[in-house]
A protein has these predicted regions:
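Short hydrophobic/aromatic patch on the recognition helix
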Residues: 70, 206, 255-260
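Basic, amphipathic alpha-helical hairpins
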Residues: 135-141, 159-165, 178-191, 210, ...
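N-terminal regulatory/effector-sensing and dimerization cores
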Residues: 20, 25-110
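Residues within helix-turn-helix
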Residues: 193, 204, 240-242, 253-254, ...
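A short, Lys/Arg-enriched amphipathic alpha-helix from helix-turn-helix/homeodomain DNA-binding modules
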Residues: 150, 166-199, 221-239, 274, ...
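Amphipathic alpha-helical segments enriched in hydrophobic/aromatic residues interleaved with Lys/Arg
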Residues: 108-164, 179-180
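N-terminal low-complexity or simple alpha-helical regulatory segments
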Residues: 1-22, 34-35
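Terminal helix-turn-helix DNA-binding modules in bacterial transcription factors
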Residues: 213-253, 273-310
Length: 310
């Protein structure tokens, strides 16, 4: 498993195409026909999944999300996704490349990214997504068409940001700033003091902000983020466990093993083996190398819940 968007030369199967304008759509059923998409994958672009028919699960960062018509999931760059492939479950998947659609909102950094739409909210999102699908199929080139598709995506994402739970009251407060700083540097340092000095806060202020937001200390928030990335890479890449540890700031494999066992309750090897044993429907999986670098969502997109232990 690897980062969505790499070429076949990277050992990674076909991925959702973003199209000539940097925006694309595909159905979940179409993805499920590709063996590479039925195993755990790391995303290197944002995906919106709007369930249209059936019932089942979509796994996002080891959280099973119950899906039925009207379920909306925003999966962000760097997250681990497992589509499931349950018979009868289908969805429209909207994908976009933030490098080519630079003005597209990243979504609230602390948002859950999971909604069960109803009423006017459901109608509005369905209408926006449906029109985007139609226009992507109709318009294949041209400056005006490119602007149309990008603006439609922006409107859709802004509408989602206005959903309940789509925005966070204080995106500039101590906790939000700390989360962004951790997202940028968790593989280099796990010391709260370094983050506090960089941000101009005291350790006590950051710890208090983390406790108020999550019930966990600042050090635990950092460790949760490192643990999540370790779980992602162990589940989704085939690099030796020692390489995963070094990528996350553990020069010595034994130190990484102790850290992971303390946080998860099992060794890195046992966790990887358990993830590999998860059945894929239909049968099949793809093994690919460790990504060359950790994907970092500039908005710090992972949520407090997704940082917790699975």
């Amino acid at each position: 498993m690897g980062l969505i968007g790499h070429s076949a030369d990277d050992g990674i199967g076909a991925t959702p195409a973003v199209g000539w304008a940097g925006v694309g759509t595909v159905t979940l059923r179409e993805l499920a026909t590709d063996r590479a998409h039925r195993a755990a994958r790391l995303l290197d672009r944002h995906l919106l999944v709007l369930v249209t028919v059936g019932h089942g699960q979509l796994e996002l960062d080891f959280r099973p999300l119950q899906c039925r018509p009207g379920t909306l999931v925003w999966a962000r760059r760097g997250q681990m996704v497992r589509y499931g492939g349950q018979p009868g479950l289908d969805a429209i998947v909207v994908c976009w490349d933030t490098s080519s659609v630079a003005d597209a909102p990243d979504g609230a950094p602390l948002s859950d990214g999971y909604w069960q739409l109803a009423g006017e909210d459901e109608d509005a999102v369905i209408n926006e997504v449906s029109q985007l699908v139609v226009d992507i199929q109709r318009h294949r080139s041209g400056v005006l068409a490119e602007e149309l598709l990008r603006h439609q995506l922006t409107v859709l994402l802004l509408r989602i940001a206005l959903l309940p739970g789509g925005a966070t009251p204080d995106e500039t407060g101590a906790y939000a700033r700390f989360r962004r700083a951790v997202e940028e540097d968790f593989a280099r340092t796990r010391r709260v003091e370094e983050y506090a000095e960089r941000m101009g806060y005291s350790v006590r202020t950051i710890t208090r902000a983390c406790l108020n937001a999550t019930g966990r200390s600042a050090k635990q928030v950092i460790d949760d983020r490192v643990t999540l990335e370790a779980k992602r890479l162990l589940a989704a890449a085939d690099a030796p466990i020692a390489d995963v540890g070094r990528r996350l700031g553990f020069p010595e494999p034994t130190n990484f093993g102790r850290f992971f066992h303390r946080e998860v309750g099992v060794s890195p090897g046992a966790f990887r083996q358990a993830q590999r044993a998860i059945p894929v429907t239909p049968a099949g999986s793809t093994r690919v190398p460790l990504p060359r670098e950790l994907p970092v969502d500039a908005a710090g997109a992972e949520t407090a819940r997704s940082w917790g232990r699975a």
